[in-house]
């Protein structure tokens, strides 16, 4: 892997890495890596990682070389002859651009390329390092266990500061080879980090088959295949939007196109823009024309005033005014069944066809018709050429989910019952509101279910609608058919609540806010009800005021997608901790004894967490399929679970999810690396660096015996599994035997002596000795090399099990005397030196590959003799004197110089030295050197 990266860095130009995989490895070990990116995305592949266009990074050459901080790589966008955009990697050495330090004794800080002065900005640097530390911990919470996850804000608004909303009006393309269409579509987009979700509704056109995003040159940036359905709503997501396209999106330079696959081959297109009305919009309309192939259309975004019955609206129109026309008078009408209710006159132009106005003081009849979707808004031009578009106003439609988590802690009289309520709503264009409700852990029978406003007085309920909820098996469903326009507006602004009153709690035992959950690209929400999460479902039950629900699904690749919404999780007394780490979500089997299949999903704060879990064991997939799995959220107050729910996800996964194939350079397939012990320090977030191996999860730093071969010992080191074969000590006897239940042979004489002396050793410990290093039992009298993680087996020591006491006695190995003048250590892990073999004259390249003797090593373009040592050279960096490589019978091994652990917080690295040192020690040495220099000058 590392030499493959060296080869890539040498070539400097990469679009994708091709080659062959390593030859069949001796052990089934693979470190977890990032998933391969879709082939449809433009970018660069570098060392198994995908980078978007115009991304910059420091290349990581792996152990023991690490990150090249003085080398900057850039994914440059290129265009082929056919106009297709692809990525090309270029790397340059930045060390030549370093400014000259202003001090006499500059230092090189870890992770930096340029030297800096140790004094001056120390205070600011310390603050920045603290900020980086907390930012890193914050970022860790945003990472899912295997792949990815993000957390929503705790704010009650559905959109946080990291999201941006856009809108597009799509009309028939008049300059296309396809016939112009009379269809109109409205698309709403939300950009969150690097993902763009979209909700599209359309009229007067058959369901499209393809959605395409077009860049400034008219080239396709992304395509979305529309799934078949019998409705007029399209939901989709564009993941990993490249940075150039994100800039074009922010600059309102991207277009969106939709085409049908039927015989008519219609196409609609429009520009994606930002608009100030999107934030407050609660009603909308699509305006179409009765003409055939008109290419005209419009959309209306409307909202009610918070206190008065004023209807604010903005019209966006296309094709109504001929190009190049000056001011054109239009009439904007509000109608009910062809009866004119209101009319506004205005002038618009082809360049600025947007129109904004307020319809003041709507009466009760107009508000009633508005709530039923029966009000029609129309725009008509005046003059010789009359053009007309119109559409009905209804509650704003999108792919977002109206939902609510009901908890006892959110009730007007807060409690801790451990109960839960989970509600999902659907608002129809005619104003009716469907609901589905699940409950668990109620203390008594349900008296009423109601939709309410926020209490105007303390503990004084403000009931709007009583829902006729009849519960069957703790489920209820129904419809509220007369939702007023004002309440529809409040519903879409997250201002309404749902309340469940019981016999013992007549004012309400469970309560929750009805919130719009933004669409995230998963269809589980649109097709399934969430799983309730409650304290009463934890084993043993927990009396808590918290509750939650979750959507869980398994895709065709056997990856588990989850989304969790919680309400009222308990917080610890330490506000600083509870503000950052709110909960831990995990998934497992209903049988608490089956801890091997419990998986941590993510740590999160706020009210929402979502992500993807890969590499699921067959056993856990089977439990998901049979409905015997659970999802649990734990907190600091309840570390063994505060809320839990039983999940049932039917799937047809008969084997673990396949790993992504990664291609390696075939030229470097014999390279082996020895890990640097100083980089294997204990990590406080062990779940982030844990390993998945043979269907089981292992925490960072743990060791175990693998199932495929009990004569190996495996350890987990920062998401990488390292398995070492058991090292057997050298026996001094001539005849050995191999016991079936042991990995190492023993002396046959020792076995016979044991049998004859069995009567004398009646008090011998029958179980043997337990050694903490390899966590194994060793038979009485056996010897072995100790296993010390993360270093592996130590050849310089031999341990013996004292059978009479059960104690382990370890002593250093005595090395034999050598006759040669220049002995060598064949392997850094070997305890004793050996005499090197006699040197042979160098061979030609052809002979090197065909020699029958000891294999030589090829590193880059150079060949090295067995036992030969050298410092590797890296392109753009030069010789790396802190790393030593050696040839071990045809296998190249490299190791960085081992550095002592430092106790200071701010270590520095000086030029010419491989190990960092404390700045205090450095300054002290500098002062002593200066004093010595002064004394020298005094003597002269």
Curated annotation (Swiss-Prot):
Coiled coil: none annotated. Residues 1-19 form the signal peptide. Residues 162-277, 279-398, 404-519, 525-652 form the CHRD domain. Cleaved by tolloid proteases; cleavage participates in dorsoventral patterning during early development. GO terms for cellular component: extracellular space. Gene3D superfamilies: 6.20.200.20. Keywords: Developmental protein, Glycoprotein, Repeat, Secreted, Signal. Residues 42-118, 689-748, 767-836, 855-919 form the VWFC domain. GO terms for biological process: anterior/posterior axis specification; caudal fin morphogenesis; determination of heart left/right asymmetry; determination of left/right symmetry; determination of ventral identity; dorsal convergence; dorsal/ventral pattern formation; embryonic heart tube morphogenesis. Glycans are attached at residues 347, 430. This is Chordin. It comes from Danio rerio (Zebrafish). The lineage of its organism: Eukaryota, Metazoa, Chordata, Craniata, Vertebrata. The gene is chd.
